[in-house]
Amino acid sequence: MSWQQRVDDALTARRATDTLRRRYVVSQGAGRWLVANGRQYLNFSSNDYLGLSQHPQIIRAWQQAATRFGVGSGGSGHISGYSVAHQALEEELAQWLGYPRALLFISGFAANQAVITALMKKNDRIVADRLSHASLLEAANLSPAQLRRFIHNDTQHLSRLLQSPCVGQQLVVTEGVYSMDGDSAPLAEIQHIARRHHAWLLVDDAHGIGVTGDEGRGTCWQRGVKPELLVVTFGKGFGVSGAAVLCSESVADYLLQFARHLVYSTSMPPAQAQALSASLAVIRSDEGRERREKLAALVQRFRAGVNASRFTLLNAHSAIQPLIVGDNSRALRLAEALRQQGCWATAIRPPTVPVGTARLRLTLTQAHEACDIDRLLEVLHGAGE
């Protein structure tokens, strides 16, 4: 088979199963409204949960820092790219979340890949929730360790897998809030089981940090759990981009030596780090608390309204509210029907989610108003097939 034939066959297979992904060009993609092709839509696809991407204080912080530092970092943090802005943000994050150290990464994907591939060795085992993010599962597959996946949120299955003999170390991998289902992991029980088997715990709290817990400290803080490795990302609740790993002093020093994504990548712009510090200040403030309370009320309003519909609603109380429709083509038709009525929603299909669970992944944000939720519900009730 030629290279071109391989490419063509893969694309043909995706088209045949209605799983071909595409990008949409937008002129505004975050906030209450999405603007595409000159038309304005209510935006139910954004991860900007607290509406901070449009916050004037954060925008101003980025602009001022760009004037001071320039628009790029100039290199890896190991060479010339670790600025006072990066250092300040790392120290603020560590203090906020109660860890000795925080290390910044350019993305959550890079952070997960770096930590797992740096830590895991040939005789080790990774035990991951089977619905873990692609960055976690891909990192596990790329590492020399054995990967075992436990049934979603099934702590008994997790315990059985950890009990089987392992010559090396074991790492349990889970998420705080699951990106496609919107539900939360039983973190306290998972941590208890991991410690009983002398395993370390890695929690990716991309969709919980900033949005849940006291001062927005996330799902782990809310549940009284402190994993050995906590990954937080900044493209959701923080409204910016990037990520950080929270860990011990020695693990941070280890990652600075062996995490290749950290060593060999240009660090985030200092202006971005400064904007993230400003975002953290908003998250921790009374304004941040009010934004979280408003979002929680909107989620409750949506769930109360959709319960009477024909759609299957998962047990999700986060900003992520997936409506399971099952069939790929039906999910695409439903997303298009909503867009025709002025509501932008995204159809999620395999391989992102398991076969037979295609869905509309609706995300609510603090930027929405109650009337927006009511409009979405009205359109959904009229769009069922």
UniProtKB/Swiss-Prot annotation:
Its EC number is 2.3.1.47. Keywords: Biotin biosynthesis, Pyridoxal phosphate, Transferase. The modification N6-(pyridoxal phosphate)lysine is found at K236. It catalyses: 6-carboxyhexanoyl-[ACP] + L-alanine + H(+) = (8S)-8-amino-7-oxononanoate + holo-[ACP] + CO2. The keyword Transferase applies. One of its GO terms (biological process) is biotin biosynthetic process. Pathway: Cofactor biosynthesis; biotin biosynthesis. Pfam families: Aminotran_1_2. Substrate binds at R21, H133, T352. Its cofactor is pyridoxal 5'-phosphate. Pyridoxal 5'-phosphate binds at G108, F109, S179, H207, T233. GO terms for molecular function: 8-amino-7-oxononanoate synthase activity; pyridoxal phosphate binding. NCBIfam families: bioF. PANTHER family: 8-AMINO-7-OXONONANOATE SYNTHASE, CLASS II AMINOTRANSFERASE/8-AMINO-7-OXONONANOATE SYNTHASE. Belongs to the class-II pyridoxal-phosphate-dependent aminotransferase family. BioF subfamily. Catalyzes the decarboxylative condensation of pimeloyl-[acyl-carrier protein] and L-alanine to produce 8-amino-7-oxononanoate (AON), [acyl-carrier protein], and carbon dioxide. Homodimer. This is 8-amino-7-oxononanoate synthase. The lineage of its organism: Bacteria, Pseudomonadati, Pseudomonadota, Gammaproteobacteria, Enterobacterales.
